[in-house]
């Protein structure tokens, strides 16, 4: 890919793999080995220097609604409430308020945040913020979920709960997930 200075960066080389629909792929490696670069290419945030990446039969050339991203840090809009953060993508798609309200409530219950909808996200713990980020991703029903070390900043107990939640959601939804981590335990 090209760096902000226009220099070519070879973070990945001779990489070729296929992920079947409904699989959960964990990419494990030390810091700096290209894990996040792989995810950023899959998300369409950066273009590969050579080669292609496809989702279904479509080449990925930029961000798209068919992919959802959960970052290491929640990347939430701190000035918005939990409901407003989770509903953000639906609002951008101009989903009807009645439908979006029901979907938000459903996903907040799934991620264990029922009753926190009107809470500003800056008042939440790190684990709760990650659950908001997960709900915000999943409510848009992406074909592919990209998770960039989403558990890395959490304490051990919260990390274990989030691991269980991610596995439960994966099993129940059948979504395809790529999870990036540097932790063998994850």
Which role does the model predict for each range below?
Residues 80-87:
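Short coil-to-helix segment of the ABC ATPase nucleotide-binding domain corresponding to the Q-loop/switch region
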Residues 51-63:
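Conserved ABC transporter NBD signature motif
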Residues 87, 98-116, 167-168:
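Conserved ABC ATPase "signature" region
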Residues 145-148:
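Catalytic Walker B motif of ABC-type/P-loop ATPase nucleotide-binding domains
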């Amino acid at each position: 890919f090209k760096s902000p200075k226009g220099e070519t960066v070879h973070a990945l080389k001779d990489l070729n793999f296929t992920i079947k629909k409904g699989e959960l792929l964990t990419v494990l490696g030390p810091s700096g080995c290209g894990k996040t670069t792989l995810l950023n290419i899959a998300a369409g945030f950066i273009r590969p220097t050579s080669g292609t990446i496809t989702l279904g039969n479509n080449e990925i050339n930029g961000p798209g609604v068919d992919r959802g991203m959960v970052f290491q840090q929640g990347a939430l809009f701190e000035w918005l409430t939990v409901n407003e953060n989770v509903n953000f993508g639906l609002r951008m798609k101009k989903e009807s308020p009645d439908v979006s309200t029901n979907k938000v409530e459903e996903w907040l219950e799934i991620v264990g945040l029922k009753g926190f909808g009107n809470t500003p996200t800056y008042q939440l713990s790190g684990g709760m913020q990650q659950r908001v980020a997960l709900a915000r991703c999943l409510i848009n029903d992406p074909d592919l979920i990209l998770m960039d070390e989403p558990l890395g900043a959490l304490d051990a107990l919260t990390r274990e709960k989030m691991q269980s939640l991610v596995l439960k959601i994966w099993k129940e939804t059948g979504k395809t997930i790529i999870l990036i981590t540097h932790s063998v335990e994850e």
